[in-house]
């Protein structure tokens, strides 16, 4: 497998610049995202109002193609209208007791084809018709839980379990926002790869460009995906595409810990260190360590690595999607996680997930060239 990985790297290095580098530009991809219509400012809520979200309607809108959805309006209910609620039996019922479950289920079935090619989905939190996991569930006229999943979203996600989907409220968390956007752009690039005729050479280049990004998310699946690419010539195209899509999607869906970010950056450092003097090497290692301690945003060491990759004409590193996983204009990766951030909420890794920080440039480059 190591020999196969080296072969993948050599194949990308031999590619023409327009294939090996320019395809990684995140601005070249315009992801299609589903979105609750009210988040775009459309007056479709039960009270005739909207829930316009600035990040969705002002920031993301400049980079994506929205596919607005409002199940309640699309099944013929007007705005304003009776409010709906989700029952403990999973039914979508109006205040007067009318059951709209079958209508929303049929709508999800009708829109399945259009929604199948999405790169992500932003839903309205607590909405009984398009919320994801914080929908209030009623029983006997009382709210019994706030963790329901409404009828429409349940069916959309059941058809595509790895679809990146978030409620707009959770996107206020900078790490949740960053993880969601990264998944969306990675999925959009995968759709572009497999959206038409493709060759093994295309898959080899795609995987090589995503090597560090996959390593940061899920080293085990990254290894499995690399092995699949290495033996892809022996399998049917449809099978290779299905297996790679599943591995890639599951890997990207895993949140990146701070320790794995540092590991990926040390690998990146190993690809450029031979071209740098000792001062620049120490600068890079110091910024990676500062990020490990939670003192600086991820953008600081990544920007430094990108700068040196460009300056040294390190084509393989410059082409890595890890350095530019989404458009810079989105302003992500600019939060310092802090030294005491818990693992599940802001990316701080568990102690057992940590690798010891390298003390010298030589330590950092050990094993970083595979």
Regions found by a protein language model. Give the residues of each.
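Short beta-strand segments
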Residues: 36-37, 70, 122-126
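Short N-terminal binding/cap micro-motifs at the start of the first secondary-structure element
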Residues: 40-48
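Short catalytic helix/loop segments, enriched in acidic residues and glycine
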Residues: 49-66
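Compositionally biased, intrinsically disordered low-complexity segments enriched
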Residues: 1-19, 339-359
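Acidic, Ser/Pro/Thr-rich low-complexity regulatory regions
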Residues: 165-341, 345, 353-354, 359, ...
């Amino acid at each position: 497998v190591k020999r196969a990985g080296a072969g993948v790297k050599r194949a990308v290095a031999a590619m023409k610049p327009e294939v090996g580098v320019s395809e990684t530009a995140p601005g070249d991809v315009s992801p299609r995202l589903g979105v609750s219509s009210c988040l775009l400012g459309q007056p479709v809520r039960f009270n005739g109002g909207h829930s316009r979200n600035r990040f969705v309607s002002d920031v993301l809108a400049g980079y994506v193609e929205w596919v607005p959805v409002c199940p309640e309006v699309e099944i013929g209910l007007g705005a304003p209208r009776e409010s709906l609620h989700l029952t403990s039996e999973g039914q979508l019922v109006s205040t007067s007791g009318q059951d709209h479950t079958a209508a929303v289920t049929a709508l999800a079935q009708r829109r399945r084809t259009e929604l199948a090619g999405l790169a992500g989905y932003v839903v309205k939190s607590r909405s009984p018709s398009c919320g994801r996991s914080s929908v209030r569930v009623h029983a006997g006229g009382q709210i019994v839980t706030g963790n329901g999943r409404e009828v429409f979203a349940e069916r959309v996600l059941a058809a595509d379990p790895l679809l990146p989907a978030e409620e707009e409220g959770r996107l206020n968390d900078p790490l949740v926002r960053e993880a969601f956007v990264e998944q969306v752009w990675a999925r959009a690039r995968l759709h572009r790869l497999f959206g038409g005729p493709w060759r093994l050479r295309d898959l080899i280049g795609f995987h090589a460009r995503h090597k560090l990004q996959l390593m940061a998310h899920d080293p085990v699946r990254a290894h499995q995906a690399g092995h699949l690419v290495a033996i892809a010539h022996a399998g049917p195209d449809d099978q290779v595409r299905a297996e790679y899509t599943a591995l890639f999607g599951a890997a990207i869906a895993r949140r990146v810990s701070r320790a794995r970010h540092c590991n990926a950056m040390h690998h990146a450092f190993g690809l450029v260190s031979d071209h740098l003097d000792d001062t620049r090497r120490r600068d890079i290692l110091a910024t990676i360590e500062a990020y490990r301690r939670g003192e600086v945003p991820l953008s600081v060491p990544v920007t430094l690595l990108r700068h040196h990759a460009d300056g040294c004409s390190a084509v393989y590193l410059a082409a890595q999607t890890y350095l530019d996983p989404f458009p810079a204009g989105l302003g992500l990766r600019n939060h310092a996680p802090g030294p005491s951030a818990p693992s599940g909420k802001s990316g701080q890794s568990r102690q057992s997930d940590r690798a010891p920080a390298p003390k010298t440039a030589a330590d950092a480059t050990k094993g970083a060239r595979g």
